[in-house]
Design a protein with these regions (language model features):
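Active-site beta-loop-alpha junctions enriched in small/polar residues
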Residues: 6-10, 34-36, 56-59, 96-98, ...
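Aromatic-lined glycan-binding groove of carbohydrate-active enzymes
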Residues: 180-199
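N-terminal pre-domain/capping segments
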Residues: 1-89, 112, 116, 123, ...
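Active-site acidic/histidine proton-transfer and metal-coordination neighborhood
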Residues: 66-165, 174-175, 185
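Histidine-centered active-site/metal-ligand motif
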Residues: 160, 171, 192-194
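Short acidic active-site motifs
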Residues: 39-40, 178-182
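A short, acidic/glycine-rich surface segment
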Residues: 15, 174-177
Length: 199
């Protein structure tokens, strides 16, 4: 296991190269990145940083609009292939609708149609997908993958070992989910870990 960070606001201000240099100088060994590019991969290698997880471009993969979903799926596959090409191994995703009032039932129905295609591509590329359990904004908390019930349904639809979770206890605590019990149930699905203070 290597300790790294997600990109804080100051990293966007100074640029990825200076941020990577700061990480290396301060003893960090890894970094989570935006959608991976050749330049970001080169910078990580130059500074001896392992690529932790790489964000996918969010273009509305759970949209009710089929045209939006097709575009999102195409970009998602490109992001996964770029992770493989430029030295990454894990794709970080938030599975949420572009309309926060969209029902979970609708989101699950859309997920069941489109995510098997995403994961099939990840399997071909040898890339892991880690679902961030961020529940989304109140009052809807519309995102999938933030409760045990939702995770069970997700893995029932897509049982592939290439689909797992980014274990972040803070998000579970926020909506009063027992994060230790959840870890016991889904420990074999953990592909990445985030830690932060929470109450």
């Amino acid at each position: 296991m290597k300790i790294g960070t997600r990109m804080p606001p100051f990293a966007l201000e100074v640029g990825f190269e200076k941020y990577a240099n700061w990480l290396a100088e301060n003893g960090f060994e890894a970094v989570d990145t935006p959608p991976l590019t050749a330049d970001i991969g080169r910078i990580c290698a130059t500074h001896g940083l392992e690529i932790g997880s790489c964000d996918a471009t969010d273009l509305g993969i759970l949209s009710k609009d089929a045209a939006v979903r097709r575009k999102a799926l195409s970009q998602f596959k490109k992001d996964i292939s770029a992770i493989k090409r430029f030295g990454g191994h894990t794709c970080f995703v938030v599975i949420g609708p572009d309309d926060p009032s969209q029902s979970r039932q609708t989101s699950v129905e859309i997920f069941s149609k489109i995510y098997p295609k995403v994961v099939e591509h990840a399997e071909r590329e040898g890339i892991q997908i880690a679902i961030e359990p961020y529940p989304g904004p109140a009052p809807y908390y519309p995102n999938l993958g933030c409760t045990p019930e939702s995770l069970r349904r997700i893995f029932e639809i897509v049982p592939s070992a290439n689909l797992g979770i980014c274990y972040d206890p803070s998000h579970f605590a926020r909506i009063q989910i027992d994060y230790l019990r959840l870890l016991h149930e889904f420990g074999d699905r953990v592909r990445h870990v985030h830690l932060k203070d929470t109450e």
